[in-house]
């Protein structure tokens, strides 16, 4: 058999974050241990029935089985614009400022190819969703990580970035509400970031997949596009995955600066063939009619969050109370590294949590819990961890 060599861009990739965890998980499961997985952020609850019914109706229409538009149906893009106006007070032109995505991950992964040339500098706030820096590397860009530290409320210290770096930078990736830290960003942070990036002509790529999983109705996570002038420099990636329990449906959107949206569209027209049209029609119903469901979903996650936080605090494990996302970002006990601790937890208790350093160097000393099992299983999981 021929020995084919992987391209350098793949050969130099570190192992996928969850690959090593899955290997240990399989070994533990083979011993007959009851596994409770709080690792990957994949909702355990079903897509709501009204969306499923809309999908059933859409599937029955023959026209929906043809090639879709690579930018998304105009009706879908219009509903995205309607939702942004209702939720954030942001006005969008569905023809030029909205594009449909086969999940936000696809759009984020493709975006650097539209604007990053080999050697261009891209700032990536870390700990982070790995796709930001991996996609940048695939496009030939140079990555400079910007640390998110607890003493700064897991926000980047924009003033600590030298002016020369801002002058060189072509793009910055930010993500709030944040995965993995669960931090949120106030509007003032976005105002400062937009001001700097307008001054130095830096593209802002903002990942907002978790804006609808929040716990304070009086302090809802904003869109960066709420900031005057943000459209000059920003594109925002959003998804229906977490908002409506639709991770497997693969549907999302990117909105903002029309040049940035068009550039992403140019990549997509050459790389994919768009979102299955029946999924888009069901997504229109989700965006239009899903507010009550989202309110109920937040209530469930709030209960789960409180269960985990109370149990962790009783066990002496330090963590902040998250104001958004379905993650808890907790400190590992003294004397452990992140990797050592989560491996011990998995091997001795059967509970899967994620090591913080898997999201970047500043994540060392932390681990992430996903609130993606029911309350009883969460109580059992944290009880097992507390006995270590």
From Swiss-Prot:
Keywords: Aminotransferase, Pyridoxal phosphate, Transferase
EC code(s) of this entry: 2.6.1.83
UniProt-listed Pfam families: Aminotran_1_2
Positions where N6-(pyridoxal phosphate)lysine occurs in the chain: 242
Organism superkingdom: Bacteria
Cofactor requirements of the protein: pyridoxal 5'-phosphate
GO-annotated molecular function: L,L-diaminopimelate aminotransferase activity; pyridoxal phosphate binding
Record bears the keyword RNA-binding: no
Annotated metabolic or biological route of this protein: Amino-acid biosynthesis; L-lysine biosynthesis via DAP pathway; LL-2,6-diaminopimelate from (S)-tetrahydrodipicolinate (aminotransferase route): step 1/1
Catalysis: reaction(s): (2S,6S)-2,6-diaminopimelate + 2-oxoglutarate = (S)-2,3,4,5-tetrahydrodipicolinate + L-glutamate + H2O + H(+)
Broadest EC class assigned to this enzyme: transferase
Function: Involved in the synthesis of meso-diaminopimelate (m-DAP or DL-DAP), required for both lysine and peptidoglycan biosynthesis. Catalyzes the direct conversion of tetrahydrodipicolinate to LL-diaminopimelate.
NCBIfam families the UniProt entry points to: DapC_direct, PRK09276.1
Subunit structure: Homodimer.
UniProt family annotation: Belongs to the class-I pyridoxal-phosphate-dependent aminotransferase family. LL-diaminopimelate aminotransferase subfamily.
Name of the protein this chain belongs to: LL-diaminopimelate aminotransferase
Species: Nitratidesulfovibrio vulgaris (strain ATCC 29579 / DSM 644 / CCUG 34227 / NCIMB 8303 / VKM B-1760 / Hildenborough) (Desulfovibrio vulgaris)
Gene name, Swiss-Prot/TrEMBL: dapL
């Amino acid at each position: 058999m021929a020995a084919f060599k992987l391209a350098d861009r793949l050969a130099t990739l570190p192992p996928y974050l969850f690959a090593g965890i899955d290997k240990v998980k399989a070994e533990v499961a083979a011993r007959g241990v009851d596994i409770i997985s709080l690792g990957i952020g994949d909702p355990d609850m079903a897509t709501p029935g009204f969306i499923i019914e809309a999908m059933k109706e859409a599937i029955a229409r023959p026209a929906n089985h043809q090639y879709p538009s690579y930018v998304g149906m105009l009706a879908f893009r219009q509903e995205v614009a309607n939702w942004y106006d209702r939720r954030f007070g942001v006005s969008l032109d569905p023809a030029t400022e909205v594009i449909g995505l086969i999940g936000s991950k696809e759009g984020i992964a493709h975006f650097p190819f539209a604007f990053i040339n080999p050697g261009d500098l891209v700032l990536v706030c870390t700990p982070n969703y790995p796709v930001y820096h991996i996609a940048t590397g695939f496009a030939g860009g140079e990555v400079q990580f910007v640390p998110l530290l607890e003493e700064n409320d897991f926000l980047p210290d924009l003033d600590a970035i030298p002016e020369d770096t801002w002058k060189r930078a072509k793009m910055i990736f930010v993500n709030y509400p944040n995965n993995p830290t669960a931090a949120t960003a106030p509007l003032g942070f976005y105002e400062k970031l937009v001001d700097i990036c307008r001054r130095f002509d830096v593209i802002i790529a903002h990942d907002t997949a978790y804006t609808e999983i929040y716990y304070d109705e009086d302090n809802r996570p904003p869109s960066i596009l709420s900031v005057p002038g943000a459209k000059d420099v920003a594109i925002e990636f959003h998804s229906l995955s977490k908002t409506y329990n639709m991770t497997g449906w693969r549907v999302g959107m990117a909105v903002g600066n029309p040049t940035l949206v068009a550039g992403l569209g140019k990549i997509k027209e050459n790389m994919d063939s768009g979102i299955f049209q029946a999924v888009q029609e069901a997504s229109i119903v989700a965006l239009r009619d899903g507010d009550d469901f989202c309110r109920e979903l937040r209530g469930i996650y709030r209960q789960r969050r409180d269960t985990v936080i109370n149990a962790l605090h009783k066990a002496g494990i330090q963590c902040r109370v998250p104001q958004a996302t379905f993650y808890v970002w907790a400190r590992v006990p003294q004397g452990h590294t992140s990797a050592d601790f989560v491996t011990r937890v998995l091997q001795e208790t059967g509970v899967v949590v994620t090591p913080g350093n898997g999201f970047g160097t500043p994540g060392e000393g932390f681990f992430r819990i996903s609130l993606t099992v029911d309350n009883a299983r969460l109580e059992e999981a944290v009880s097992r961890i507390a006995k270590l």
